[in-house]
């Protein structure tokens, strides 16, 4: 694996403080250094979003059921296997609470809780006028479509973050310090901000519900 500590390359290099894009590009450069150096500056990374697969059927059906025209569409993604495993995520009920508070404070904005059909956790909430749940299928092209509709994304560190980064959707990510410098966004011309959470911070967080 390219992210493994045991990864070996033809030319060894120090990876501890490098962004993953730097690591990958350095490996690509090793294939043909002359060709890379001649052509790399001609790449416009802001246009990579045009190469993504796109399927609007699911998102079109979703928005057909919403009659109101909102000023902004905000996506909220609470799910990440990596964040759960490492203890960097909030409880789902707190994500729901955040979404509800935001929807009440900003009635002219549409807030969408993002989920996927194969997730073992599904939202069971009372959806109001400007708080909805979008459940994606297994098609990455459908996720691209709904992501393109967003004006802003609030998320834990997961694939949605990187997809919206490519699409240049402004994003606020709850992430670890390691993931922040290794996989931090903003490389494609968009805006990316982060809130760093420390390892095992959930131990103190859980005490709130034990009192």
Give a label for each model feature.
Residues 1-211:
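Catalytic machinery of carbohydrate-active enzymes
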């Amino acid at each position: 694996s390219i992210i493994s500590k045991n990864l070996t390359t033809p030319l060894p290099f120090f990876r501890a403080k490098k962004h993953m894009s730097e690591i990958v590009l350095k490996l690509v450069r090793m294939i043909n250094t002359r060709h890379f150096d001649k052509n790399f500056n001609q790449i416009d990374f802001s246009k990579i979003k045009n190469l993504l697969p796109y399927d609007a059927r699911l998102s079109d059906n979703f928005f057909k059921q919403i009659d109101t025209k909102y000023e902004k569409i905000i996506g909220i993604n609470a799910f990440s296997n990596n964040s759960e495993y490492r203890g960097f995520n909030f409880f789902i009920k707190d994500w729901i609470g955040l979404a509800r508070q935001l929807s009440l404070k900003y009635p002219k904005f549409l807030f969408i809780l993002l989920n996927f059909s194969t997730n073992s956790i599904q939202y069971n909430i009372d959806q109001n006028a400007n708080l909805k749940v979008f459940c994606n299928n297994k098609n990455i092209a459908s996720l691209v479509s709904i992501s393109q509709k967003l004006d802003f994304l609030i998320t834990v560190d997961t694939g949605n973050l990187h997809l919206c980064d490519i699409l240049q959707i402004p994003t606020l990510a709850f992430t670890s310090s390691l993931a922040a410098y290794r996989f931090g966004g903003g490389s494609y011309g968009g805006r990316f901000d982060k809130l760093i959470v420390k390892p095992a911070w959930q131990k103190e967080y859980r005490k709130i519900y034990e009192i």
